[in-house]
Amino acid sequence: MKIGFAFCGSFCNHPELLKIYEQIAQEHEVVPILSENAAKYDTRFGRADAFVERVESLASRRAVRDIVEAEPLGPQGAMEVLVIAPCTGNTLAKLAGGITDGPVTMAAKGHLRNAKPVVLAIATNDGLSASAPNIAALLNRKNYYFVPFGQDNAEAKPTSLIADFTQIIPTVELALEGRQLQPLLL
């Protein structure tokens, strides 16, 4: 199976997601896609060049890094499913609003034109505040599927939501059948 895997800039989640990504890459052909932020920013969680190198090495191919590279993915039918993980509040807003201004949102737009599933693994500090309407909008749209999610450290960050990244593969399997993995809320 050919799986698109798009990383956005929730940098603290990259190490955990790389483990899931590695599992997927061992069993499937992966099309790596990086948001511009994920590809270029060095943070306290790691250097961008090391992250990009690891993503590309595991997939044995260059990552899609801009709109021009992402645009042909849809018309070519390049993927059976697209996973966006971590899907940030910013990306949720763009998807909900139909804004296509980067490689991840362009890949999603092109993929959806083929009526194929997009799996979102959210990681956002404002999931129960500013991002809540965007989550609701996408839950109500065809071909979007969510990795089950819940509050992330409810005492310290009461509006923060995070997907259970270990559920990405089961979510993908059901999304390919047109079904949402349940329970959705953890």
Predicted regions located by residue number:
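A cross-family phosphate/adenosyl-ligand binding-site feature
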Residues: M1-V118, N125-L186
